[in-house]
Regions:
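Canonical tetratricopeptide repeat
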Residues: 39, 73, 107, 141-143, ...
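Bacterial Sec signal peptide processing site at the extreme N-terminus
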Residues: 15-37, 253
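Structural marker of alpha-solenoid helical repeat scaffolds
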Residues: 29, 63, 97, 131-133, ...
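Terminal, low-structured helical/coil segments at or just beyond the last alpha-helical repeat
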Residues: 202-253
Length: 253
């Protein structure tokens, strides 16, 4: 009797599971819930509430394990949790589900470079940059350059920064990277030209102004160094870059 009852209950349960898996309305409801829980999980992740983020993203995966958005968000979570094996798995799964999504390619590239896998990181940055669906290819080329710099491939990095600037001439971080490399390698005239040209026609940043001070100072151009130092102190008085001026011994006042 008990065996028969157990068999009946298992049969009913199996029928309900199959019904839930095949009912289009229930599937749509679960997928909508997964979208909602993914958004909540990402919001918690951005606020640093990792336990709540994991709870919501685990729930989202149960609701729709084949969503690339869910897998991508989980990859970012596992990266924050310092679980590289699980992060890798989730990144791979997201790219399996959406192999041409440039945002997933870029996110995975950032993760790879931050974990020291530079060559693979550059590969995925370039895939994102060359993807016609990617709205900010200059960012990906710039990121590839930063990744190459971390591996001390400065010549290849310069090409990436120049490509980024060819796409977006207003890209201040690429200008800084390019001029800083020239400064590092003693190409002061080239660094001077890049900085002056940009700062005379585009919006300044504290990092660019400090680099300009250093380049002018290295060239022995004390007057221009002081002028850029003054701009830095006036426009960004509380910045780390303004505080760094004291190490150069310049009197901008």
């Amino acid at each position: 009797m008990r065996s028969a009852l157990r068999g009946l209950l298992l049969g009913v349960l199996g029928t309900l599971v199959l019904y839930g898996c095949s009912n289009p309305q229930l599937i749509r409801q679960r997928h909508r819930a997964a979208v909602y829980n993914t958004e909540l999980g990402v919001a918690y992740l951005q606020r640093g509430e990792l336990a709540l983020a994991k709870e919501k993203l685990d729930q989202a995966e149960r609701e729709n394990p084949d969503s690339p958005n869910v897998q991508s968000a989980r990859a970012l979570l596992f990266e924050r949790l310092r679980e590289p094996a699980r992060a890798d798995h989730a990144f791979h799964r997201a790219l399996e589900l959406a192999p041409r999504n440039p945002d997933y390619q870029n996110d995975y590239a950032v993760y790879l470079c931050s974990s020291g896998r530079y060559a693979r990181g550059v590969k995925y940055f370039l895939e994102a940059a060359r993807n016609p669906l990617y709205l900010t290819p200059a960012d990906a080329f710039d990121n590839a350059g930063v990744c190459l710099r971390a591996e001390h491939h400065d010549a290849a990095a310069i090409k990436m920064f120049k490509t980024a600037l060819a796409i977006n001439p207003e890209f201040s971080s690429a200008v800084w990277e390019l001029a800083e490399l020239d400064y590092k390698h003693g190409r002061l005239k080239q660094a001077h030209s890049e900085l002056v040209q940009y700062l005379s026609t585009h919006h300044e940043t504290a990092s660019l102004l400090l680099l300009a001070v250093r380049v002018m100072h290295a060239q022995g151009d004390t007057l221009d160094a002081v002028l850029y130092a003054r701009r830095l102190q006036l426009d960004y008085p509380d910045s780390p870059q303004a505080r760094a001026l004291s190490t150069l011994g310049l009197n901008s006042g």
